[in-house]
Amino acid sequence: MRIAIIDLGTNSLRFDVYDVYDDEEFSLIHREKFMIRLGDDVFTTGQISDKVMDRAMETFDLIKIYIKEMKIKETFAYATSAMRTADNAKKFIKKVRKKIDVD
């Protein structure tokens, strides 16, 4: 089975794709890093700015294409402190979930 893991950090988004085998072995088949700078305004204003949100959504548009073309079955995401701190994190998560099917 092919899975993707999205690591949404304060400065970058890392997108990794793995093939996972029945014997619980796995292999990394794709790794990409995008500089979306999610935390640019979060630590000063408490909000993910519209500009940063738009930049992130452009990245998720590309990730959506990767998910389809690479035949990824499941996508998992986790985020670091910028997302936990942002007052509008729920809005951001809702927009991401509209773009891609993610847990």
What name fits each language-model region?
Residues 1-8, 16-103:
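Nucleotide/phosphate-binding catalytic cleft detector across ATP-hydrolyzing
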Residues 11:
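Primarily the dimerization/phosphotransfer
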